[in-house]
């Protein structure tokens, strides 16, 4: 023991400090303050004093011992039922002391000592609480102690054996470990009461379970009796029919055959049914296990009774028709869970419908609904908690007045017809020279202040690869200027631009460019456009034709006048003092500034700090730049701006909207990302399964893996689409990855892992990426013009094509004499009629102009000397490899197979 203070020792003994100081004083330990220290010697003196104060006379101890044996049923880890013998032993010790004559009354509280020893052969039953008797002693100054025994707490079970032993008890030495409080006694009594309640609940549940099992057995027996009666009636009927057949057979003199019974050779279905009855049900936990398939405890063989009736009792059930809510995409396992069936059942049904699926495959909504209806359930299209519904509620502010806005004009036409040059003259800036190859490869958006008002121009590419970009331009525009070269006429992209404008319902203004050239023919252009459905105003149509020259500036003012006249007719208006809405015209990834998107504001006012949601991307507008790169704070309707601060590069053509809540914008963006990923995965898996067998039949297709990186989203999209169109049945372009931004080290690692070639369009790789590519041997190609990229990829695909084999006849030989040599075989003496014959050439043996054999020459000689070739009008001797069937008059057609390179 360590030294403690008087107050700490009083807390340990659970008694007042004043009482402890009095006892210490009577024990000869001089302590007067609660903070005085007590050492081991002081504590020993106090203990000796207390022992002397209690005395040794007339102490008796009563010991009660009780035993009880019971049985419980439990299951082991294998589910087998076991009967376990449980023996409960309880022991109580009661101590009684005499009362002194002059001493005050002191109560010695003795708790009930419960010592339960449970002996179980294999399984440990429910835990039994052990209670150790610890008498509580309240010390008083007088040495005489009065002991009053506490009432004994009865056990929850009857006591079959009880022994009472009276003996002289040894002096009880009160120690700190033997002191117990009244709260502890109450807690133990409460615990004993709960144990009794738990035991009663378990016994009641056991009785109810046995009653249910007895009821099920009775119902099963009744069903078996009914089945036996039905079978007996059927058997009697069959016997009567058999006797009738036997009598007929006896008259005809035939042998009698026993009728086939269920379970015999002729009835396989009956045998399968009986086998199912023999196995029965597997016993589970909680059952008694009697008669189970693993109940053979003593190693004896146990014969199972086979019920020859109609089977065990089964409650009649009718098919459950469920309402299954199908989202846009759902996996096979989730669909099976919704219908409460196994996934293999769905796989079987879809195999019958002609689709091979796996348990984790994602199905689209239409396919899943067909499967659900095929299986007899009711399919409903699920109405998810779509955050996009918030955008529908986020309608235009009707109280904001509409104001006049500038027209958005898109310049469209064929490549090299002068679209950008026309805009340059209007903007008084030479932009075409900055484009690689002099062709526009991404959308340029500008707004121009003219004398008649402001006009916003969108310049679209004319190359065939940029179809999607032209479609986006027509979608975002109010008026289309169709530029047609007077010396070139209507070309394929001109027709496509007309179709885009008509599909968008946008008026056309035709600018006949390059009228200053000597070979210009504007009248031919008009006739060709009339054939395409574009009627000039002078012919009674609604499309004004303006002859212009982008080089000299002729007709530019008339063109702008026609554009503004069309805008006045359209009466273009938009809300200005409202949250902005617009269209993402172009997007790219800038190394220093991150995601940069060109946005055309269509209504409202876009300000710095607004929360913008564009498709699957959202973000706060950190900065806004105009088309000249100057920072601005706000942009109204029909103004194109570059915005910075989006979380990722948005897809070109996405609708952009300003929201007031960043949390809602993030929620909608994440929802769209998950939805897009699920739909894309479903399409990929469907395409894989549809093409799997076709690829197995056609053989392996050679693939050219590519990684495409471009400066802007539109150029990357156009390049991917154009390169994908180069694929055919033998070679295929596989786009491993396509993105905007510089070539990074992750792109090089991906190319090294997939064996791909990196194509950089208007971008370059940094120093680290170049070194990594050199170490890995990754090929990086840089292009500034889309023509060059397409031509080189086409050449690479042509090299991957297997060469074409062509057959060329080189000579004709006539057999004039045949010699038979024992070791060699048949030798033909021949005359070369035309051409030449070489050693090891391939020949065809012709007899009466019918091919008899096709093979190779074995040897070629002239005057007993081996020669390499023999030309026309010369004689030679030859033998055929593996063929001796030659005759005089046969002809040999000599030919060779040449491989010719193919091209796309």
UniProtKB/Swiss-Prot annotation:
Residues 459-462 are annotated as: G3. Gene3D superfamilies: P-loop containing nucleotide triphosphate hydrolases, Putative DNA-binding domain, N-terminal subdomain of bacterial translation initiation factor IF2, Translation factors, Translation initiation factor IF- 2, domain 3. Residues 438-442 are annotated as: G2. Its main location: cytoplasm. Residues 248-278 have a biased composition (Basic and acidic residues). Residues 549-551 are annotated as: G5. Belongs to the TRAFAC class translation factor GTPase superfamily. Classic translation factor GTPase family. IF-2 subfamily. This is Translation initiation factor IF-2.
